Amino acid sequence: MSTKNRDRLVVTEDSDDDNEHEEMSSGDNSGEEGPSYGDAAARDPDETVAFPAPQRKKKKVIKKLTRKEQSLKHSVKEYRIKLAMVKPDITTDREKERNLRRIATKGVVQLFNAVSDRQKTMSDAVKEKMTARDRKEARERFDGKNFDSDKFADSGYGYGGKNEVKGEEEDEQMNIGDDEIDAGNYSDED
């Protein structure tokens, strides 16, 4: 094989433009699609192949914010705080959380008391000696579809008008009593 018919590539180290240092001689490959082992063996062993130096990665430039950008960022943060888009902090709102827990507990107690009273009246009505027709009417009367929420509120389970409006003195007295009760039964570790 002669060197005239083969392609030759010469690359020098630290080359910026690959086209400057490449030498291509076009020749007939005699139908071969790619280089073969014979071509590699026929090369001059003293021939050196140099590769270009790897390009260095650019360091990320940390952009320092201008005063205008800083003030804009601060105003956006304040706006989010105004919109209550901040996670609640239990340590600062401990009193508020305790009041909400107490209200929820009262609501659940009222609900269970109402359910037990309803079950009691229903079982009393069913225990009476009745005809089949009277039992059917009693079941329809105690059906959930016929439940009267006004009657529920009047029976003392719902919130009345006088419970919603409280004086500050009455509220303070209630907080003192709740603290004494809660101290023995509950812990704030949940």
From Swiss-Prot:
Q: Where is the composition biased (Basic residues)?
A: 55-66
GO CC, sorted alphabetically, is: preribosome, large subunit precursor
Annotated Acidic residues bias: 167-190
Name of one Pfam family that matches = Rrp15p
Coiled-coil residues are 59-84
- Tell me the InterPro entries matching this sequence: Rrp15
Segments of skewed composition (Basic and acidic residues): 1-11, 119-153
Q: Which UniProt keywords apply?
A: Coiled coil
Q: Where is this region: Disordered?
A: 1-69, 119-190
Biological process, per Gene Ontology: maturation of 5.8S rRNA; maturation of LSU-rRNA
Q: State the similarity comment.
A: Belongs to the RRP15 family.
Q: Which PANTHER family match?
A: RRP15-LIKE PROTEIN
Protein name in UniProt: RRP15-like protein
Organism of origin: Caenorhabditis briggsae
Q: What is the lineage of its organism?
A: Eukaryota, Metazoa, Ecdysozoa, Nematoda, Chromadorea
